[in-house]
Swiss-Prot record:
Keywords: DNA-binding, Nucleus, Transcription, Transcription regulation. PROSITE patterns: RFX_DBD. Transcription factor. Acts as a transcriptional activator by binding to promoter regions of target genes, such as Rec8, Mxd4 and Ddit4. Plays a role in natural killer (NK) cell maintenance and immunity. May play a role in the process of ciliogenesis in the neural tube and neural tube closure. InterPro entries: DNA-bd_RFX, RFX-like, WH-like_DNA-bd_sf, WH_DNA-bd_sf. Changing residue 658 to A: Loss of nuclear localization. It comes from Mus musculus. Residues 12-21, 521-534 have a biased composition (Low complexity). This is DNA-binding protein RFX7.
Length: 1459
């Protein structure tokens, strides 16, 4: 059989060969036989076949050939025709065993497509359809598919088809619903047999014909999709793309002066309802002219969401049909650019195309802004994008105002839009909401906002008086009308009116879209009526047309485009009318700058700065740039103007958009931000180096700043400040900048000198203060400004002081750097700089924070990302976000991120964020808003990005992302839970009981404190069944589970804590000495209580003794940390935030984590104990830090929580992590986790050791030993507490992020232990510049990576270690321009670990940080350190004795992993 089977092929080959041989020209015959092959190849093939056949068969074939040679040609032909074909019997039998062949499937596929069509009102019986198919196959001799396979093909052809059972009872049949037979069946196209022979002639024609048919089919399908999408977006039916294009042109959604528009309009009368294909082609032509615009517009808005959701075809379609995307995009951007900075030059097709790329947002708004604009702008209507229909140009003034108001929400919307479908819905509503209010409020100013964006820049056509409104930025619409911004401000926090409304605006700044709510908190603070707050929005990504490459990236990356939109929206400048003339100049200058700089920064809108006269002391240039794009792309920053009424030019450079897009368009939801953040960080570091990333459009070309930028490269934080100036010099933008600057100078020399640029470098929010005169504005001025600015006094005293301090050093970039580092340790460094930048923009940040972390989420996250550690943290969330599979996970992720980011920022930000975050849940909180928001942005730079509950761009999380459920209970509650002490303090009572505050019962509000809280009794019983989504949220893992939609059954105890226990917990927290914590005490205690109870019932398979010992540790820790109780509080606060998490099935573990390595490490299969551990070590860490920010703010006074957050978040987080670990994780794991903790702990130790470690000499060893917390009894407990404190920073999983946070935390902690201890009060908030300087010294030490392990352990260098880690992280970030990438890797790794081992990756390694880089050196030192070895041995012993039987018995993989 085998021989026979193999005979035919050789025969076939040979027979043909024979013909050629007999023929004079055999060469010709062979090719004919094998048409595609030349003679040599055919021979080679023949030899190959021959060699593959056995000798006997070859001999047989040779014999046959010899006989065949005797045949005549006719006989040979007959033989050839008679040769058997098809499969051999053996192959046939095999084939039958198979389900079906590709050919059969194709036959069935073609038959189904040619015979059936969709029709919503008819159904076809399945059997009838299959019988027809079978008869068709029988007629043609095909082998029919089985009924099951045929059904699968049917599903592929008609994915929307559903099976229904129709008919009377007893006679029902299964039918395909929505199908019918085609009335006319087209003749199937047959392949062109002459294809090869014809050569070029026919070959070109035939294929082109076929391709054309295919293209037409695809194009028509794409057109259908686009029309369907347009109908949803515009609430108006479109049968063809031509109709849609006509509508878009008619309603001025796009420019009317382009050839495509003219062509469409000319063709419209003839037949609006043209054939779909023609309509498709028309759009194509149209798209060519409009494409840039179209592309740009869609990316920022719903279009993106829609596209993402829809098939790629649709995306192509959108690009094809610029009108559609343009419309959608225009719609959103227009609404966004309320400032009347309609960037779209209506009459300017050429400009339009570049503009769209660079500035999606601006393009849309331009039509609406002004009558003048209207002429220019083709799409005036877009302003009303919320409605889907736009107001006509005629409503220019009102529209513009509406836009500016709307803009704020819009931008956020845009941001969300780019990341996910959730954006579109959000977009729509916010659009609709802002429209009415905005129109009424901002109508007056609208004229100023003339959009000249049609060209990348160009001056505003608006009168000088309206200069302030005018935005020069080509992409950014920066004309926020200062007229009553109250309502508008609410709508668009970013649009803070110059008037007193600014204050309100600060409060309002809730981000409607998760994307960004940049508010001009400062502006509002500045309550100077002239629109003192100039909102300058620089969207780096939007950048200028100049940055086409970048823009392209942005376009390609949806995130980026939205970012641009946001920028346009946010780029609203409120300038006092008095300064109008200058602003206009500046505006132009800025535009030029943008052009000059390839950077993404739009020309800064100096206009705002011009307000100087109006600003007087109050005026703060509030750059409310909201991160329109996903979370990070850019954050709005507001810089308070100098005392001398100078609005610093805050330039928001969002490099992140570009990077971020690349990093994660994903989702990004926030996820995209990660990479961008890293990149941004890198960009910040190397402002000049990365044209795309760096938005060098620094207002002030300060050579001194150049140095700063260099330093910044090392330390992303630093970069933010320093870069601005030097980059300007470096970059072409310089002249433009200079021009801008003169404007600024005109306004006020001091103001000029300190150009405050709010840059979003990468994810980092950079407020670049550039001073034209090197020293003229610098520290003193800055300090003055900070002090003068209302924002400082109002709520953000703490932050402002820090800011001041940093600013004071600003002239000296290094000094600034130093101060920053000192302030925050390594993380603080970044943050500090951001702080400096943000200080002025604190109100904005506050607002953003207020806007429930939306903006902070994005902007701050960026900030943190800038700082290395923070970056890591930030990115983890993003990774998680990218990974997240479900909405729930997304929400959890967001919460996690929020908490984590908050904690990051928090650590960096002196815990101001804490308060801010607190506000996030209650963005409305006006009183706290300014301070809390301020803090929040600062501290939760990273936070908001991932989990911007308010309007998470990436995820649609409720504003109070911090605590969706119990966490959300009350902003104040979450705050109190979140108080820094709360976290760490939590450890004392609750952690003692639970072994870790993270173990707090999920249901309990305090459960946030215990990120690692056992998921809940239910979860404990079946960790896999109900793993908290946020389990890997670092601190808040468990808490998220508890606070989120946890079923009541899940946390029965949480709801009814013992009064005794509550009191005990409260006392413990209060005892920590943090009034704020005490205020929050109940919540934390509640959490602890619940935690304790859950813990006991759950037991997490962790021996009770382990549990007890851990509680002991926590208690001791508490006692030890008492002096630094704020730190502990911070931890608690962090927990609170995390608590927001939802309890979700385990599978979500990895995907949902937004917060840090820990977040990634949700344990899926690991026993509850492991899970707890994980939460503690990996997730808990960051979230703890994060939460504190948000939670603390609402509680009591924003100030205290802030302080607590600063000092406590990191240390507490670490301590808690360790405690939890020891409690529920095997020593091995703990050891592994602890090492990084110990290292970072040491970093933190500097301050902590001073305060606490001084008493814990042995504790230092234990800081390393902390790995095996279970180790011991009271002595160990005390050590454990210390280790927790120290380890907080070093936890590997979140080592980087935590390090950054911890460093800052420890710095502040030590600096202002009294503050920490104090009850909430402004005192805490405002750290004196002296403290900051001290911190800077510490920071310098931290920078010293060479400090030995012992030094770190000693506690003097605790911060040093942190700093080193942070530094390494920043270096890594610099090295890997895409820090987020690395982070993502880590995240993926952690995810893998989670999935594989359900082990906390933190235990194994720190995904949050580039592994082995920063930590490895320290780790090596530790390994060599006798203390460390001792600890390790003790840990191991304790592990064996601790009773990790659960690991042995339940989690073999875990044990193996540990081993």
């Amino acid at each position: 059989m085998a021989e026979e089977q193999q005979q035919p092929p050789p025969q076939q080959l040979d027979a043909p060969q024979q013909l050629p041989l007999s023929a004079p020209n055999p060469g010709v015959a062979l090719p004919a036989l094998v048409p595609g092959l030349p003679g040599t190849e055919a021979n080679a093939l023949q030899h190959k076949i021959k060699n593959s056949i056995c000798k006997t068969v070859q001999s047989k074939v040779d014999c046959i050939l010899q006989e065949v040679e005797k045949f005549t040609d006719l006989e040979k032909l007959y033989l050839y025709l008679q040769l058997p074909s098809g499969l051999s019997s053996a192959e046939k039998s095999d084939q039958n065993a198979m389900s079906s062949s590709r050919a059969q499937q194709m036959h069935a596929f073609s038959w189904i497509r040619n015979t059936l069509e969709e029709h919503p009102e008819t159904s076809l019986p399945k059997q009838e359809v299959y019988d027809e198919y079978k008869s068709y196959c029988d007629n043609l001799g095909y082998h029919p598919l089985s009924a099951a396979d045929f059904g699968k093909i049917m599903k592929n052809v008609f994915p929307n088809m559903k099976a229904r059972r129709l008919g009377t009872r007893g006679k029902s049949k299964y039918c395909y619903s929505g199908l019918r037979k085609k009335a006319f069946v087209h003749m199937p196209t047959l392949p062109n047999l002459d294809f090869h022979k014809t050569g070029d002639g026919l070959e070109g024609v035939e294929p082109s014909g076929q391709l054309q048919n295919i293209d037409e089919e695809v194009i028509s399908s794409a057109c259908r999709l686009v029309c369907e999408w347009a109908q949803k977006v515009l609430s108006q039916p479109f049968d063809t793309v031509l109709e849609l294009a006509h509508f878009l042109v008619k309603s001025h959604y796009i420019g009317t002066k382009s050839m495509a528009a003219l062509t469409v309009m000319a063709a419209a009368p003839a037949g609006l309802k043209g054939i779909p294909q023609p309509s498709a082609f028309i759009p194509t032509a149209e798209s060519n002219s409009f494409q840039p615009q179209v592309k740009t517009l869609p990316s920022p808005i719903d279009a993106k969401q829609q596209l993402q959701r829809k098939i790629q075809k649709k995306q192509q379609e959108q690009k094809l049909q610029s009108p559609l995307p343009g419309e959608s995009s225009a719609k959103k951007p227009e609404g966004t650019t309320a400032n009347g900075v309609a960037n779209l030059p209506n009459g300017n097709p050429a400009i339009l195309s570049p503009q769209p790329i660079g500035i999606v947002v601006a393009a849309v708004p331009s039509p609406i802004p002004v009558q003048r604009t209207r002429q220019l702008v083709t799409s005036p209507s877009p302003m009303n994008s919320p409605d889907g229909k736009v107001l006509p140009l005629n409503v220019q003034v009102v529209t513009q105002h509406m836009q500016s108001v709307k803009q704020t929400p819009k931008t956020p919307q845009n941001v969300p839009a780019s990341p996910g479908g959730d954006r579109s819905a959000r977009h729509r509503y916010p659009q609709i909401l802002p429209k009415p209010a905005n129109t009424s409020a901002l109508t007056i100013r609208s004229p100023t906002t003339v959009l000249f964006t049609s060209s990348p820049i160009k001056t505003a056509v608006v009168p000088a008086s309206h200069m302030s409104s005018l935005n020069v930025v080509k992409m950014t619409t920066i004309s926020l009308t200062p007229s009553n911004s109250n309502a508008p401000l609410k709508h668009s926090a970013s649009v803070s009116s110059a008037t007193g409304t600014t204050e309100e605006s600060r409060i309002v700044p809730q981000i409607k879209n998760g994307s960004v709510v940049s508010l001009q908190s400062p502006g509002s603070r500045a309550s100077s009526t002239g629109g003192t707050s100039a909102v300058e929005v620089k969207m780096e990504p939007e950048g200028s047309s100049d940055e086409h490459p970048l823009q392209c990236q942005e376009n390609s990356e949806e995130t980026k485009a939205p970012l641009t939109t946001s920028s346009a929206l946010w780029g609203q400048k409120s300038n006092t009318d008095g300064t109008v003339p200058k602003p206009s100049n500046e505006g132009v200058t800025e535009v030029k700058t943008t052009k000059v700089c390839d950077q993404r920064t739009k020309c800064k809108n100096r206009c705002n700065e011009i307000l100087s006269g109006i600003s007087a002391g109050n005026n703060q240039s509030t750059v409310t740039l909201s991160v329109a794009t996903q979370n990070l792309p850019f954050t709005s920053t507001s810089s308070p103007s100098n005392g001398d009424s100078v609005n610093k030019d805050p330039k928001i450079c969002t490099k992140s958009p570009r990077k971020r897009l690349s990093a994660t368009l994903q989702e990004s939801q926030v996820p995209p931000v990660k990479k961008p953040i890293v990149e941004q960080l890198s960009a910040v570091t190397i402002e000049g180096q990365k044209p795309g990333t760096v938005k060098k459009d620094q207002k002030v070309p300060h050579s001194g700043k150049t140095e700063s930028s260099t330093a910044g490269a090392q330390i992303p934080n630093k970069v933010s400040i320093s870069v601005s100036s030097q980059i300007i010099e470096d970059q072409p933008v310089n002249p433009a900048l200079v021009t801008s600057e003169p404007v600024l100078e005109q306004q006020t020399t001091p103001s000029s000198s300190p150009d405050v640029k709010v840059k979003l470098e990468g994810s980092v929010f950079l407020l670049d203060r550039e001073s034209k005169s090197d020293g003229s504005f610098n520290r003193n001025e800055w300090q003055q400004v900070t002090k003068d600015s209302d924002f400082i006094a109002a709520s953000c005293e703490h932050q402002q002081d820090i800011s001041v301090m940093t600013i004071a050093e600003h002239p000296d970039i290094h000094d600034l750097e130093k101060s920053v580092w000192e302030l925050e340790g390594m993380p603080q460094d970044t943050y500090s700089q951001q702080l400096h930048s943000q200080i002025p923009e604190s109100s904005l940040n506050e607002i953003q924070a207020q806007s429930s972390d939306q903006l902070p989420l994005q902007s701050e996250l960026k900030e943190f990302e800038s700082s290395v550690s923070q970056t890591n943290e930030s990115y983890f969330p993003f990774d998680d976000e990218l990974t997240q599979d479900s909405i729930v996970e997304e929400l959890v992720l967001m919460e996690q991120q929020m908490s984590m980011n908050n904690s990051h920022s928090y650590g960096n930000c002196l815990g101001m964020s804490l308060q801010n975050q607190s506000v996030t849940p209650g963005a409305p909180m006006s009183s706290h808003a300014s301070s809390t928001h301020f803090y929040h942005p600062i501290h939760s730079n990273g936070t908001p990005i991932h989990t911007p509950t308010p309007t998470p761009t990436p995820t649609p999380t409720p504003t109070p992302t911090p605590t969706p459920t119990s966490e959300m209970i009350a902003g104040s509650q979450s705050l109190s839970r979140e108080s820094p002490c709360s976290r760490l303090a939590q450890t004392t009572p609750v952690d003692s009981a639970l072994g870790s505050s993270r173990h707090t019962p999920i249901g309990t509000p305090h459960s946030n404190c215990s990120s690692s809280v056992p998921p809940s009794p239910v979860e404990c019983r079946n960790p896999f069944a109900f793993t908290p989504i946020s389990s890997s949220m670092a601190y808040h893992d468990a808490s998220i589970v508890s606070s989120s939609p946890v079923k009541p059954m899940q946390r029965p105890m949480a709801t009814h804590p013992d009064k005794t226990k509550l009191e005990w917990m409260n006392n413990g927290y209060g005892g920590v000495g943090n009034s704020s914590v005490s205020g929050h005490g109940i919540l934390p205690s509640y959490q602890e209580l619940v935690e304790d109870r859950f813990r006991k019932p759950h037991a997490f398979a962790v021996p009770g003794q382990s549990y007890q010992s851990q509680s002991r540790h926590h208690d001791t820790h508490f006692g030890r940390l008492t002096p630094v109780s704020p730190v502990q509080h911070q931890g608690a606060t962090v927990n609170t935030n995390k608590q927001e998490g939802f309890a979700v099935p385990a599978p979500l573990d990895n995907k949902g984590t937004n917060s840090s390595a820990g977040s990634n490490f949700r344990c899926r299969s690991v026993s509850p104990a492991v899970h707890r551990q994980r939460n503690l070590s990996g997730s808990t860490l960051y979230p703890v830090s994060n939460i504190p920010r948000s939670n603390v703010t609402p509680f009591g006074s924003p100030v205290t929580p802030e302080v607590h957050v600063f000092t406590n978040v990191h240390t507490d987080a670490c301590a808690n992590n360790i405690a939890q670990r020891s409690q529920s994780v095997p020593l091995t794991v703990m050891m592994q986790t602890a090492f990084p903790n110990a290292l970072q702990k040491q970093t933190n130790s500097k301050k902590i050791t001073n305060v606490l470690l001084s008493k814990l000499d042995s504790d230092n060893d234990d800081s390393v030993r902390g790995l095996g917390i279970n180790n011991v009894p009271s002595n160990y407990t005390a050590r454990m507490n210390l280790t927790q404190i120290l380890e907080t920073s070093p936890v590997f999983p979140s080592a980087n992020s935590q390090n950054m946070i911890d460093s800052s935390t420890s710095v502040y902690e030590f600096q202002t232990p009294s503050y920490l201890t104090k009850s909430n009060s402004t005192d805490q908030i405002s750290f004196s510049p002296g403290d900051n300087q001290a911190q800077s010294e510490i920071g310098e030490q931290q920078l010293d990576f060479n400090s030995t392990v012992k030094d770190l352990l000693s506690g003097d260098n605790l911060q040093t270690s942190q700093q080193l880690v942070g530094q390494v992280a920043s270096d890594l970030t610099n090295t890997a321009s895409d820090f987020s990438s690395d982070i993502r890797l880590s995240s993926d790794l952690s995810g893998s670990i989670n999935d594989l081992n359900t082990l906390d990756p933190n235990l194994l390694f720190d995904p949050g940080r580039q592994q082995g880089q920063d930590d490895e050196a320290t780790l090596e030192e530790l390994k060599n350190d006798p203390l460390f070895q001792q600890i390790c041995s003790e840990s191991m012993n304790s592990m064996t004795s601790s009773g990790f039987e659960w690991i042995e018995s339940k989690d073999h993989p875990t044990v193996e992993m540990l081993g």
